[in-house]
C-alpha cells in the first residue's frame, strides 16, 4: 500500500503542483498563483455537507462498553490511512443516540485534529456504525467525491496550510474552522474525470489491500487462539 499511496502522490503532484497534464492550457492569475483557466479555488467547507467532530461519552455521564457501536479515537487511525480496529472503543445505542451529531457514515473522511495531527482514513462499510470523539474531525463531502478529496490528503495538499494554522495549547490542535478553510484547487469537470480515472483504481486497490490485511490478521489471531487452547 505504500507503493500505491506513493503513486497517488506522484500523480497528484504532476497534476496539481506541476500542471503536467495541462501544460498547454492557458493560465490565469489566482490569489494563490497561476492556475489553468477554468480551474478554480474553493474552500473545503464549501465542498462538504458537514465538517464536525465528536464528544467523549464520559462528559455526558456515559461510559464505554465491551462491545457495541465502534468508537474511533485518534489512535484508531494508522499512519498508512487504515484503521486499527484493535484500538476501537465501543458505546451502546443509547450513547450513540446522544452523540448522533458525530455519527460516522460510509465514505466519510476522518482526520485527527488533536494529539497526533493529520492522520486520516476513508471510512468503508466494515467500520460503521461508528462514532468518534473531539480529537477526530468528520469530513462529509457533497460537491467533490470523497475519493478525490482523499487523494488531495494523500498528496499532502493540506500539510503546510494546517501546519501554519495549528493552535498551540496544552496539546496542539486544529479547529474545525481551520479544517473548513483549506483552499482546494478544483479542475474543470473533464479534467476531474481524467484525473479520477487515474487515481480511483489505486484508491480501490488500497482499500482492498486494507481488507485483506485485516482478514489475514484475524485468521492469524484465530490460529494462535486455537494453538494456545490446545496446549
Model-assigned labels for residue ranges:
Residues 1-55, 181, 185, 189-231:
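Non-catalytic DNA-recognition/assembly elements of restriction-modification systems
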Residues 73-74, 93-158, 165-171, 175-179:
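A short beta-sheet element
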Residues 156, 161, 202-205:
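C-terminal structured domain segments across diverse proteins
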Residues 40, 67-70, 87, 135:
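A generic secondary-structure signal marking the coil-to-beta-strand transition
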Residues 27-28, 45-62, 75-106, 126, ...:
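Sequence-specific dsDNA recognition surfaces
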Residues 64-65, 218:
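A glycine-rich phosphate-binding loop feature that marks nucleotide/adenosyl-phosphate handling sites
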Amino acid at each position: 500500500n505504500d507503493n500505491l499511496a506513493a503513486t497517488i502522490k506522484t500523480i497528484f503532484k504532476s497534476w496539481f503542483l506541476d500542471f503536467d497534464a495541462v501544460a498547454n492550457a492557458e493560465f490565469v492569475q489566482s490569489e494563490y498563483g497561476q492556475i489553468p483557466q477554468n480551474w478554480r479555488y474553493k474552500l473545503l467547507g464549501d465542498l462538504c455537507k458537514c465538517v464536525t467532530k465528536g464528544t467523549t461519552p464520559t462528559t455526558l455521564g456515559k461510559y464505554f462498553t465491551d462491545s457495541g457501536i465502534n468508537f474511533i479515537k485518534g489512535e484508531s487511525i494508522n499512519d498508512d490511512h487504515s484503521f486499527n480496529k484493535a484500538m476501537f472503543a465501543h458505546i451502546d445505542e443509547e450513547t450513540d443516540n446522544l452523540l448522533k451529531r458525530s455519527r460516522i457514515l460510509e465514505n466519510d473522511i476522518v482526520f485527527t485534529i488533536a494529539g497526533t495531527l493529520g492522520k486520516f482514513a476513508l471510512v468503508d462499510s466494515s467500520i460503521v456504525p461508528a462514532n468518534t470523539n473531539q480529537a477526530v474531525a468528520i469530513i462529509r463531502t457533497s460537491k467533490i467525491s470523497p475519493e478525490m478529496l482523499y487523494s488531495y490528503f494523500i498528496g499532502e495538499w493540506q500539510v503546510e496550510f494546517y501546519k501554519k494554522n495549528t493552535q498551540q495549547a496544552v496539546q496542539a490542535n486544529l479547529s474545525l474552522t481551520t479544517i473548513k478553510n483549506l483552499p482546494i484547487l478544483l479542475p474543470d469537470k473533464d479534467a476531474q474525470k481524467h484525473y479520477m480515472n487515474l487515481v480511483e483504481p489505486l484508491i480501490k486497490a488500497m482499500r482492498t489491500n486494507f481488507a485483506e490485511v485485516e482478514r489475514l490478521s484475524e485468521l492469524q489471531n484465530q490460529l494462535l487462539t486455537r494453538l494456545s487452547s490446545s496446549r
